[in-house]
Amino acid sequence: MAEFPFEISPMFEGERVRKEGMFVELGGPKSLGLELVRAADMDAIEDDKVTIVGPDLKDMEEGKTYPWAMIFNIGGELVEPDLESVVERRVHDFINYCQGIMHLNQRYDVWMRVSKDTAGKMDSFEPFGKAVMMLFKTELPFIEKMQVTFYTGKEEVEKQMELAKEIFKARDARTKDLHDEDVDVFYGCTLCQSFAPTNVCVVSPDRISLCGAINWFDGRAAAKVDPEGPQFEIAKGDLLDAVTGEYTGVNEIAKKLSSGEFDKIKLHSFFDSPHTSCGCFEVVGFYIPEVDGIGWVDREYQGMAPNGIGFSTMAGQTGGGKQIVGFLGIGVNYFYSPKFIQADGGWNRVVWLPSGLKAKIDEAIPADLKDKIATENDATDIASLKDFLEAKNHPVVATWAAAEEEEEEEEEEEEVAVAAAPMMMPAAGFQMPAMPMMSGGSGGGIKLTFKNAKITIDKLVISEKKEKK
């Protein structure tokens, strides 16, 4: 558009600004990043006003990372506090319409980059702010007036961050007494499909969006004021499984929105047809087979999990709108859900959390498990994690003995089967070839153990090996 120094179009959604093409980075994993929308009286808003508190774009050094906070105030006859988070989530959309400006995540995890090319066309964030507000008022006509303040100084961003977290906490508390069985409809969101085309985000009273920004009430408000927008109703349909959270309506929308890639989503399952994961999730869960437990790591944690992998690597494996068995992206508020991964043990399956995340969700953790869940201060690898869980008698430890007994029973069954094999009568005319003894050295042979494996063999050919003369 001519009045702005950069092009604006939905075609730029999904555009990535790589490090080598970046002028500055705002927020992200190395700093603080925040976005917040607040409803206000019309008289308190100066329409289209952009205020910059701290260094402006022209004052920033190329290649550096700066703290960043965006506070939008909106007003209008139909504007109410229930719409704040709905409008807030569209920030992701509209910023990504701006060429050369990348926006990821939400709330207190915002990560932005401005490309060198775009920075070369403007020396201030003001035209960027005006462009985003223009898009908001064009796409969401119930917004009659809007203003924005950008904060780029660390002290002020930290102050705004603390205020915002209290607001987010109050929003999330609204669904505490409402559950999946109490409503007839859930809500879907397709905001992340520009980055994760097959992602199907289902928001229910007991499961907040992966990004943590949209709860059931937010979805309802969004679908009401913007019926053609990215949030929409999902008819629950019939309940197929109350434990896993499987509904016919959710399965139908999963198949439709993923273009047939998935035909079912179980809202409260970690392993069996789990919810898809986009890339905006706040936390990623990962299965640790050595202890038969599940660990969780959030964006704020910069270290390695006991499996030797950090958040960014696991996020790359998990995201993209896929169902990756063994990994699961969630919003932080899902930890507070009474249906939290209930199909796979719930909190009794959780074995590791970063200390910062553990402190943040302290109220969600059952009292009898708080000292049994390890952090990076207790376990940094699988061996130390196993020792910790054993010492604390974590619930998963009981499954280890059961697994060992099962393995022993399987070995006994195998031995019986081998002993009985010579007694089996072959079909007439068929001579079983002599089978050579497999040896693994002094250890007494080779042992193969398959657990929970599904093996399909179309054809098995056993033939005698003839030596060359």
From Swiss-Prot:
One of its GO terms (biological process) is methanogenesis, from acetate. It is an enzyme of class 2 (transferase). Binds 1 [Ni-Fe-S] cluster. Keywords: Acyltransferase, Iron, Iron-sulfur, Metal-binding, Methanogenesis, Nickel, Transferase. Its cofactor is [Ni-Fe-S] cluster. [Ni-Fe-S] cluster binds at residues 189, 192, 278, 280. Belongs to the CdhC family. It comes from the Archaea. The gene is cdhC1. Pathway: One-carbon metabolism; methanogenesis from acetate. This is Acetyl-CoA decarbonylase/synthase complex subunit beta 1. One of its GO terms (molecular function) is iron-sulfur cluster binding. HAMAP family: CdhC. InterPro entries: ACS_CODH_B_C, CO_DH/Ac-CoA_synth_bsu, CO_DH/Ac-CoA_synth_bsu_3_sf, CO_DH/Ac-CoA_synth_bsu_arc, Prismane-like_sf. It comes from Methanosarcina thermophila. Part of a complex that catalyzes the reversible cleavage of acetyl-CoA, allowing growth on acetate as sole source of carbon and energy. The alpha-epsilon complex generates CO from CO(2), while the beta subunit (this protein) combines the CO with CoA and a methyl group to form acetyl-CoA. The methyl group, which is incorporated into acetyl-CoA, is transferred to the beta subunit by a corrinoid iron-sulfur protein (the gamma-delta complex). The keyword Manganese does not apply. Monomer. The ACDS complex is made up of alpha, epsilon, beta, gamma and delta chains with a probable stoichiometry of (alpha(2)epsilon(2))(4)-beta(8)-(gamma(1)delta(1))(8) (Potential). Its EC number is 2.3.1.169. It catalyses: Co(I)-[corrinoid Fe-S protein] + acetyl-CoA + H(+) = methyl-Co(III)-[corrinoid Fe-S protein] + CO + CoA.
